[in-house]
Regions:
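Bacterial N-terminal signal peptides
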Residues: 13-23
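Cell-wall glycan-active module
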Residues: 2-3, 8-9, 23-367
């Protein structure tokens, strides 16, 4: 289920993906020229020995590469396998520990926020659901995000209190073997190569769908990075978060301010007269940059796109920061984000995630 920083990153990635998808219509990359059988053979070889149904995993990964015109290089194959191993251990619809407790907590939290008494919640959950069981019985038996997503969909669609609590918003926002964001998948389904019998949400919880959209989120955009670890960090924190965290660091060095290097250079929804931390610090450089507040805002609005790396603002800020530091500062940094989710039972960060995936990636390249 989605966390606040992660949800912002999903929205950022979905928006960026839509922009890139439109831009790529006229300039789609050529289809991979490698024979599909060769690609599948390499995928099988590079998987850990313990993985079951290796041929099926390989087929779905190869299909996703071909449909999205992503070159199936060893590096790209291992990037996908590393994320999949980290996120699910090669389980299409992985179980989540303590999910019934987590789900009931979410329902109770929403009820409390709306001042709905507990007895009304209990009465709503006692209603018989479309599969014949009560919602309370189903809630006690959920084991996977797909189970919970289907329960929420039925609860919202069939029980008045469900619609009141969730307002047509299903709290399950990630799923599948690569734990990809469902909003991202829904925004990027135009080239999905399989028939959709239910919804894109349903497809995310399958092996083929989870891999297709996970691969799109991981590899479906160009980056300025020279190391895969920054792409892995972006997978967790949002497209271009590593590039933007480095930009925040440059702003901090150039101004002498302490900034959170979280990759969010614009506070979501902030009006022009109430800028976020990074934008506020950047305004101190406005006279040196020859840019007023409105111009800075417009420039920062490109930070979810590749071309921000080549923008005048990016170049000028790094020129000032490099001069002050007396050396060239990094152009990519893993964002400093603490992962926050009911599914997480210990303190983890984006850096931890990216480095864990990078370790699996390097092991894969050696197989």
């Amino acid at each position: 289920m989605t966390t606040s920083p992660a949800f912002r990153s999903l929205l950022r990635a979905a928006t960026s993906a839509s922009i890139l998808m439109l831009a790529s219509c006229a300039t789609a990359p050529p289809a991979p020229t490698r024979p599909p059988a060769d690609t599948r053979s390499e995928i099988v070889r590079r998987m850990p020995a313990k993985v079951a149904d290796r041929d099926r995993w390989a087929a779905d990964i190869e299909t996703a590469f071909a449909a999205q015109r992503i070159e199936p290089t060893s590096e790209n194959i291992c990037a996908v396998l590393a994320i999949t191993e980290q996120e699910s251990g090669y389980v299409a619809n992985p179980a989540v520990a303590n999910l019934p407790k987590i789900a009931r907590g979410e329902i109770d939290r929403r009820a409390a926020a709306l001042h709905v008494p507990k007895f009304m919640v209990d009465a709503a959950l006692a209603v018989r659901s479309p599969d014949g069981r009560s919602y309370a019985e189903r809630l006690r038996s959920v084991r996977t995000e797909r189970d919970l997503s289907e329960l929420y969909e039925d609860l919202i669609g069939s029980v008045p209190l469900g619609k009141r609590l969730f307002a047509d918003y299903n709290p399950v926002q990630t799923g599948g073997p690569m734990q990809v964001g469902i909003p991202f998948a829904e925004a990027n389904a135009s080239r999905y190569p399989y028939p959709v019998e239910g919804s894109i949400r349903d497809e995310v919880f399958t092996r083929r769908g989870g891999l297709y959209f996970g691969i799109a989120h991981l590899l479906g955009y160009q980056t300025p990075y020279t190391r895969k670890v920054h792409r892995f960090a972006d997978y967790n924190a949002g497209w271009y978060a590593s590039r933007n965290a480095a930009f925040q660091n440059a702003v901090a060095v150039a101004t002498g301010n302490t900034l959170a290097l979280d990759g969010d250079v614009l506070a979501p929804g902030a009006p022009l007269d109430k800028p976020g931390q990074t934008e506020r610090a950047l305004r101190e450089l406005g006279p040196q940059l020859g840019m007023d507040n409105a111009q800075l805002r417009r420039a920062l609005q490109q930070a979810d796109q590749l071309q921000f790396s080549d923008s005048a603002l990016h170049a000028q800020v790094f020129a000032l920061a490099d001069a002050r530091a007396g050396k060239a500062l990094p152009r990519a940094l893993i964002p400093g984000i603490r992962l926050d989710s009911p599914k997480i039972t210990r303190e983890l960060t984006t850096e931890w995630f990216a480095n864990r995936v990078d370790g699996r990636y390097r092991q894969c390249l050696q197989r």
